[in-house]
């Protein structure tokens, strides 16, 4: 089968770490740790497993992190290389899978938890929290936190992948492929809304208006009784979509603190500049005394994390949805913030996400579709999606055009 593969190469990984975040365009050239290959179809010869033919497969920020080398080394033991990426997938069963007949359109919960690995349920899985399974490196599969990061299962960036019944959700007949491919990221937004624990009428800040941030706004409006939702958006179309999805206020990154002050009447504090490295003056940056009740980082960058930590009221809640970067945690200590992570989804989040995908204003959210052999263009587009007015870029695995 034809597939895109991320492989281990120390020189290319070093290059990715050195330039990936600053010049991501270089990483779709010869230095990319990605290659288009012909490889055997993945097969797991265990009960409950079946092959899926991907139709559309999204390009996620975590996929781009793997390509650019910006992913934390924390995850290095939780993947197995080489692997075929792609965990945002709508596909078609090519064989029966227990109660699901061949030809059923499905979306995939990518987490490779105890049921998929053939081991006794760990405490999180017993509690229904499969997204934080303790057994993602054991069982009959190679290590891999998700489909799309495990060498044994394949991923959506290939012509076949293999999936366990516990991961499969049938797609209703009336739901288009373009909406169905958004179900996995929407399920993450459902998980986020629940982890945020937003009290009725509470003020919320969402830093970032890519797919993660926009879907967070949508889920917060649908599933909570949040009051004002302020979104930090870099680009015009992001701002328009944020309002369409339920934001009450939208601000540019350099206006974030001012926007929060305006809506919460917080007090602005600007620390003095002090001597820093090489004798240069450095400032800790402004902060607020007061602020929003709940702040959500949907980017994972240092600047975004600083924004949410410095604009949340004392005792407020900060939710980390983007893959975190290094940051000064002094505000979390000093303001007694509750800091919560949110990762993937669990419970009935996929069923809720299927309903959202059918009802929400998601037309044209998928703004770029590419065949596998045009992967360089696809990744370049995904790197620049916000600037280009695109929310989600996908591989159309059926296409050879």
Which functions belong to the PLM regions below?
Residues 243, 263, 299-359, 397-401:
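Glycine-rich phosphate-binding loop and adjacent beta-alpha segment
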Residues 3, 9-11, 16-17, 283-284, ...:
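C-terminal hydrophobic helical "lid"/dimerization subdomain
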Residues 213-214:
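N-terminal Rossmann-fold NAD(P) dinucleotide-binding loop
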Residues 76, 87, 114-207:
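NAD(P)H dinucleotide-binding glycine-rich loop of Rossmann-like/cofactor-binding domains
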Residues 1-88, 155, 159, 398-401:
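Short N-terminal strand-loop motif that marks the start
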Residues 203-209, 221-303:
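Adenosine-nucleotide cofactor-binding segment
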Residues 194-199, 222, 287-288, 310-311:
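Glycine-rich helix-loop-beta junction characteristic of Rossmann-like nucleotide cofactor-binding loops
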Residues 40-57, 72-126, 172-174:
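Glycine-rich beta-strand-centered segment in the early N-terminal region that forms part
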């Amino acid at each position: 089968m034809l597939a895109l593969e991320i492989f281990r190469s120390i020189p290319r990984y070093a290059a990715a770490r050195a330039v990936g975040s600053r010049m991501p365009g270089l990483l779709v050239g010869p230095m990319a740790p990605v290659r288009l290959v012909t490889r055997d179809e993945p097969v797991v010869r265990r009960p409950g497993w079946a092959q899926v033919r991907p139709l559309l497969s999204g390009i996620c920020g975590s996929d781009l992190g793997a390509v650019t080398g910006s992913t934390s080394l924390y995850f290095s033991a939780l993947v197995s290389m080489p692997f075929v990426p792609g965990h945002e997938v709508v596909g078609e069963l090519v064989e029966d899978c227990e109660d699901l007949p061949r030809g059923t359109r499905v979306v995939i919960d990518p987490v490779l938890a105890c049921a998929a690995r053939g081991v006794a349920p760990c405490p999180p899985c017993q509690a229904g929290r499969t997204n934080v399974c303790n057994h993602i490196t054991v069982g009959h599969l190679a290590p891999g936190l998700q489909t799309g990061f495990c060498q044994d299962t394949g991923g959506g960036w290939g012509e076949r992948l293999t999936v366990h019944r516990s991961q499969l959700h049938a797609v209703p007949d009336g739901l288009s492929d373009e909406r169905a491919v958004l179900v996995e990221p929407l399920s993450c937004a459902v998980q986020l809304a629940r982890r945020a624990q937003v009290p009725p009428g509470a003020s919320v800040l969402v830093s970032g208006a890519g797919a993660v941030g926009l879907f967070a706004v949508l889920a917060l409006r649908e599933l909570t009784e949040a009051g004002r939702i302020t979104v930090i958006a870099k680009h015009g179309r992001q701002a328009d979509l944020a309002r369409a999805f339920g934001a009450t206020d939208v601000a540019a990154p350099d206006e974030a603190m001012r926007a929060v002050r305006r809506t919460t009447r917080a007090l602005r504090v600007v620390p003095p500049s002090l001597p820093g490295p090489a004798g240069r003056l450095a400032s800790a940056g402004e902060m607020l005394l007061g602020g929003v009740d709940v702040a959500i980082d949907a980017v994972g960058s240092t600047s975004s994390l600083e924004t949410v930590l410095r604009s949340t009221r004392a005792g407020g809640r900060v939710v980390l949805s983007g893959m975190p970067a290094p940051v000064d945690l002094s505000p979390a200590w000093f303001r007694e913030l509750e800091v919560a992570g949110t990762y993937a989804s669990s419970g009935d989040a996929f069923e809720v996400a299927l309903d959202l995908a059918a009802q929400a204003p998601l037309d044209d959210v998928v703004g770029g579709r590419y065949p596998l052999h045009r992967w360089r263009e696809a990744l370049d587009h995904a790197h620049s999606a916000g600037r280009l007015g695109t929310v989600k870029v996908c591989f159309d695995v059926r296409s050879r055009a």
